[in-house]
Structures are given as structure tokens and as C-alpha cells.
Amino acid sequence: MANRLAALVLLLAALAGPARAEWNDAERKFVIQTLNQLQKLSFKHHREYCGFLGVTAHGKFATGGLSQGTLDSCFPTKPDYLTVTASFHTHGGFDSTHWSEVPSLQDVDSDAAGGTNGWVATPGGRLWFINGTTRTLTLVCGPGCMISDPNYVPNVPGPVGSAYTYDELQRLFRD
């Protein structure tokens, strides 16, 4: 009975969709486990890997639509067997000429347009949460909390904050 109740609670939370301002601990742990597996491939091939996070009919977290992208983009296919709650992707291998430690404007725009939230893992081992409704970014955990690219150099090309509004992100990429 307790398992069924827990599954129902997870399913109802997932159906709430992008209006969720935050995440729950079970989702965060599942995302870290999933993205840590993809980080290794991302660093090896210097490509983004992406997909969708959702909840199955049985109330379990699952992924779908996994895709290999390019150096700076990735386009997963939305699975029909999940109630999708968020997108997720890696930011490829470390490159001193890219702002890969912060989600891009394209990342935020894609989540907002798709009606989802998003999760982004960076070469420095950061994990970001994108609220697709408010277009705000929150640093869930800092450098090294996830698998990091051995070539990562801190603060290149510049220092990274712990939260950004969409306007702040626009200024960051403009400056």
C-alpha cells in the first residue's frame, strides 16, 4: 500500500508539469545518476547528450528520447511512454572558448517553448535546474558535485554565479 501511495504521489507531482518551481530529492538523485553516465561520453566525444525525464504509468522515474548532439546543441525526441517533467543534457567537454558552465539562452528558450523544466550538467561537474515557466536558473550543486572533465579549468572564461534570471543570463552572454 505504501509503495502504491508513493507512486501515486510521484505521478501527481509529475502531472503538475512546469509550474513546479523546484525539484524533489528523488528526482535530483535520479538526474545526477543519469547525467553522470552521460558525462563520461560527453567528455570523450566532446558532444552534448540529451533526453527527457519523466514518470512511467507505474510512478517510476525514467528517461527517454536519448540523443547524441553536437558540440553545442542537442535535440531529443519526446517519448510518448512517459509523462515528461523535464529535459536534461550535458554540455560536452571543457572548451575555454565556450560558456559551458552555465545553461545557454537556447537551453532556457527550448525548455520554455517545450513546456518543461530542464537539467544541465557542465564539464566542471555543476548541475543546474531551469524553471521553464519563470525562465530562471538555479545551481543545484557546484563544481565537482558530479563527474567532471579532467581538462576542466575553474573560472574560464569567467566566474559563475549560483542563480540567474533570463535577463541576467542575456547580459552574461552579451558581455
Predicted segments, located by residue:
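Active-site-proximal loop/helix of nucleotide/amide-processing enzymes and allied scaffolds
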Residues: E22-N24, C74-A86, T90-D175
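Sec/Tat signal peptide C-region and signal peptidase I cleavage site
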Residues: G17-A21
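Catalytic phosphate/metal-binding cores of nucleic-acid and nucleotide-processing enzymes, i.e., regions
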Residues: S67-T70, T77
